[in-house]
């Protein structure tokens, strides 16, 4: 059964949770069909573990107009098929996805998906923003610090942490004498912290004794001005020493909805009220993917 995970959505009535529960059960049945179809396309046995991911969502202008829509599928962590920015055509990642693309083109799937993105997706975003305005449109500035790690090679890794920020959009860069170290820098994707905020770090390898020449620069809309940090020039928060744990929360089935650069959150939506999943099956009439995940072999 669907249950609230944020206080602001608890105000939705019983009919909302009943409807979403029915839709989730319909999704489950549809995805079972999709997985069996994918197994057949890739000539795989029914044994073992396989994953089908779906993400749909809309970016909306401040005046409520649709800016960009997403409708994407991935199989076993790899791109499968995605609705393009024109919301009319598809990009298929491999030969199996080409089969799905042809079936969807024949069935007019892109037109139906575009109608959902331009209509229901935008309408629900407006409702969620109205109900959760104080939470969803807030800005939490990052807590930033630099950690120091000796390497067996004799040099040092400096890691710049940004923790507890919202929304997710943030910029971390390392500089040496005012020049950005884009090529030398390791940068992880922004990750959910599990408490409604986000985390990110960027690291650079530097010669021992030269640490003070390197500066980390942090830009976020929650900051009155960008931060500039050096190793040893600030105290890390007591709860986030060198052994800071980054938590990654995978989103398997949801729709990412963003208002400008201000707000991003995940909502689970489907156009249908459940059913057999015909509009979403990979076989006769299905939809899309574009997770841009590495090391995918098909």
From Swiss-Prot:
How would you describe this protein's topology in the membrane? Single-pass type I membrane protein
Q: Which residues carry this modification: Phosphoserine?
A: 289, 292
Q: Which residues are glycosylated?
A: 43, 133
SMART domains assigned to the protein according to its UniProt record, in alphabetical order = IGc1
- Give the transmembrane ranges: 245-265
Where does the Ig-like C1-type domain start and stop, copy by copy?
142-230
The stretches that face the Extracellular side, renumbered to this chain, are 1-244
Location(s), subcellular: Membrane
Which parts of the sequence are annotated with region: Disordered?
Answer: 277-298
Q: What is its main location?
A: membrane
Q: Which cysteines does the record link by disulfide bonds?
A: 58-121, 160-216
Q: Supply one GO BP term.
A: negative regulation of neuron projection development
Which PROSITE patterns does the protein's record reference?
IG_LIKE, IG_MHC
Cytoplasmic compartment ranges equal 266-298
- At the top level, the lineage of the source is Eukaryota
One GO CC annotation: phagocytic vesicle membrane
Q: What keywords sit in the KW lines?
A: Disulfide bond, Glycoprotein, Immunity, Membrane, MHC I, Phosphoprotein, Transmembrane, Transmembrane helix
InterPro entries tied to this protein:
Ig-like_dom, Ig-like_dom_sf, Ig-like_fold, Ig/MHC_CS, Ig_C1-set, MHC_class-I_related, MHC_I-like_Ag-recog, MHC_I-like_Ag-recog_sf
Nucleotidyltransferase in keyword set: no
Q: Which family does it belong to?
A: Belongs to the MHC class I family.
Q: What is the stated purpose of this protein?
A: Involved in the presentation of foreign antigens to the immune system.
Other facts: The antigen encoded by the PAG64 clone, normally expressed only on lymphocyte subsets and thymocytes, is found in increased concentrations in all transformed cells tested, in an embryonic carcinoma cell line, and in pluripotent embryonic cells. Activation of the gene appears to be a general feature of carcinogenesis in the mouse. The PAG64 clone, and related cDNA clones, have in common a repetitive sequence in their 3' transcription units that has characteristics of a transposable element.
What quaternary structure, including any partners, is listed in this protein's UniProt entry?
Answer: Heterodimer of an alpha chain and a beta chain (beta-2-microglobulin).
Q: Any idea what this protein is called? A: H-2 class I histocompatibility antigen, alpha chain
The top of its lineage is: Eukaryota, Metazoa, Chordata, Craniata, Vertebrata
Q: Which gene encodes it?
A: H2-D1
């Amino acid at each position: 059964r669907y249950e609230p995970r944020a206080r602001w959505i608890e105000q939705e009535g019983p009919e909302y949770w009943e409807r979403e529960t029915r839709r989730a059960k319909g999704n489950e049945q549809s995805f079972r069909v999709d997985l069996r179809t994918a197994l057949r396309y890739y000539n795989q046995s029914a044994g073992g573990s396989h994953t089908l991911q779906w993400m749909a969502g809309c970016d909306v202008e401040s005046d409520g107009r649709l800016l960009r829509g997403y409708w994407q599928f991935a199989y076993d962590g790899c791109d499968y098929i995605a609705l393009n920015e024109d919301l009319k055509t598809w990009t298929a990642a491999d030969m199996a996805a080409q089969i799905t693309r042809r079936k969807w083109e024949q069935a007019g799937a892109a037109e139906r998906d575009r109608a959902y993105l331009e209509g229901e997706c935008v309408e629900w975003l407006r409702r969620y923003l109205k109900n959760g305005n104080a939470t969803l449109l807030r800005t939490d500035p990052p807590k930033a610090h630099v950690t120091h790690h000796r390497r067996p090679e004799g040099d040092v890794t400096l890691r710049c942490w940004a923790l507890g920020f919202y929304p997710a959009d943030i910029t971390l860069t390392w500089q040496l004498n005012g020049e950005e170290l884009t090529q030398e820098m390791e940068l992880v994707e922004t990750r959910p912290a599990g408490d409604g905020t986000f985390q990110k770090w960027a690291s650079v390898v530097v010669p021992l004794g030269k640490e003070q020449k390197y500066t980390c620069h942090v830009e976020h809309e929650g900051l009155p001005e960008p931060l500039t940090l050096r190793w040893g020039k600030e105290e890390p928060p007591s709860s986030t020493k060198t052994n800071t744990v980054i938590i990654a929360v995978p989103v398997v089935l949801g729709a990412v909805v963003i208002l400008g650069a201000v707000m991003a959150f995940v909502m689970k939506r489907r156009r249908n009220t459940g059913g057999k999943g015909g509009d979403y099956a990979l076989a006769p009439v299905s939809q899309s993917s574009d997770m841009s995940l590495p090391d995918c072999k098909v």
